[in-house]
């Protein structure tokens, strides 16, 4: 197991000699919910290694079996079949159950422990892991995905802007124009702290920067550090007294406090892009979630195929060799070779220095 060897080389081994891995977790479903209708018949979740970006564990939960359902509709016993129904709870609880199962089987499957987990902010999953206590002497530590932290931060500020009861329209418009500046100020402070070795003091320093960000952006520079505050910005209009008088500043600081509490995750600078990439392959295999593959075992087969495609990059060759014990023909080889060369060129292009957006605020 490559992820295990890399952890041993990095010295991430527990007192009992078992390697401690950092993993990324997330779930996906066979049906789009649009944040309102969580009623998918099937769902899957994956545990992906942080270093290798490969799927270490994947499982599927099904709430429906076509054979059993049709037999029950006519009050008959179903015939002999391989029933795919393995879940009786809600669709939203599938993800937590699968990830809990993966943590409990980590030692038996690979001889490793998942010490740190990177998630998308779903507290239910982490609570399920803690309640199950997969490792008696070790408490799993959670790190939040940086992308989700900033996305939720901006969405909550936009909700304040749209709320007519939050404060005067002039101040809410001022907040709406400066949401991106607030985000950039946090990113800039994080980037400066991560240039050197990150330690416990960096977390407290970053928290102070984040809590001071609204004051800096809205014109109050009393507590600003010269290294992150330009002289030109110090001549801005001070909106803080008006925000404080209207009560809007308190609502802004509630959102900022939530981001400051996750300063450790921001310094770790991790995201769950690797597991999102796996989910995109699953969506490709199931027709963009527009076709119902939840009647029998089709959804499980397609998710398993997505694991092969994600881990190996040569889905057709692996499946053909496993089924027929021979390598596929030249057409399949040339197709996969072109795909591999395309990915190499794309990675080489992405590694070149690019002109990025200015992070000055």
Region roles according to the model:
Residues 22, 71-79, 251-255:
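Active-site-adjacent bridging/hinge elements
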Residues 55-62, 67-69, 138-154:
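Glycine-rich phosphate-binding loop of actin/hexokinase-like ATP-binding domains
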Residues 39-40, 154-166:
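Short, surface-exposed amphipathic charged segments that create phosphate/polyanion-binding patches used
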Residues 1-72:
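Structured nucleic-acid-interacting core domains from mobile-element enzymes and related host factors
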Residues 32-34, 56-57, 126-128, 154-155, ...:
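Short helix/loop capping segments that flank catalytic or ligand/cofactor-binding pockets
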Residues 15, 19, 89-93, 97, ...:
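Intrinsic disorder
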Residues 60-104:
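Active-site beta-loop-alpha junctions of metal-dependent nucleic acid enzymes
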Residues 96-143, 147-150, 164-361:
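Acidic/histidine-rich catalytic cores and adjacent linkers
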């Amino acid at each position: 197991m490559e992820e295990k060897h890399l952890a041993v080389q990095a010295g991430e081994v527990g007192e009992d000699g078992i390697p401690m891995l950092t993993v990324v977790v997330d779930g996906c479903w066979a049906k789009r919910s649009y944040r309102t209708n969580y009623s998918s018949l099937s769902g899957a979740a994956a545990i992906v290694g942080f270093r290798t970006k490969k799927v270490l564990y994947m499982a599927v939960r099904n709430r429906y079996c076509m054979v059993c359902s049709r037999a029950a509709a006519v009050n008959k016993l179903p015939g002999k079949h391989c029933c795919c129904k393995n879940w009786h709870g809600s669709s939203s609880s599938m993800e937590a159950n699968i990830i809990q199962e993966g943590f409990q089987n980590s030692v038996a499957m690979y001889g490793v422990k998942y010490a740190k987990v990177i998630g998308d902010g779903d507290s239910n999953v982490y609570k399920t892991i803690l309640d199950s206590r997969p490792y008696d002497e070790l408490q799993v530590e959670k790190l939040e995905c940086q992308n989700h932290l900033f996305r939720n931060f901006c969405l909550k500020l936009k909700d304040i802007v749209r709320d007519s009861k939050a404060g005067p329209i002039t101040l809410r418009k001022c907040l709406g124009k400066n949401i991106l500046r607030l985000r950039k100020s946090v990113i800039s402070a994080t980037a400066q702290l991560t240039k050197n070795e990150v330690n416990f003091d960096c977390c407290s320093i970053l928290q102070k920067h984040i809590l001071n960000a609204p004051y800096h952006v809205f014109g109050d520079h009393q507590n600003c550090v010269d290294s992150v505050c330009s002289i030109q910005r110090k001549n801005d209009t001070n909106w803080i007294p008006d925000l404080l008088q209207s009560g809007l500043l308190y609502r802004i600081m509630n959102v900022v406090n939530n981001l400051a509490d996750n300063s450790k995750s921001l310094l770790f600078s991790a995201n769950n892009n690797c597991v999102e990439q796996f989910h995109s392959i699953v969506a490709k295999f199931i027709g963009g979630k527009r076709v119902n593959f939840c009647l029998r075992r089709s959804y499980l087969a397609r998710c398993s195929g997505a694991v092969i495609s994600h881990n190996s990059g040569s889905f057709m060759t692996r499946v053909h060799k496993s089924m027929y014990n021979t390598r596929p023909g030249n057409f399949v080889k040339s197709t996969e070779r072109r795909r591999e060369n395309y990915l190499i060129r794309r990675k080489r292009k992405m590694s070149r220095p690019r002109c990025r957006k200015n992070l000055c605020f």
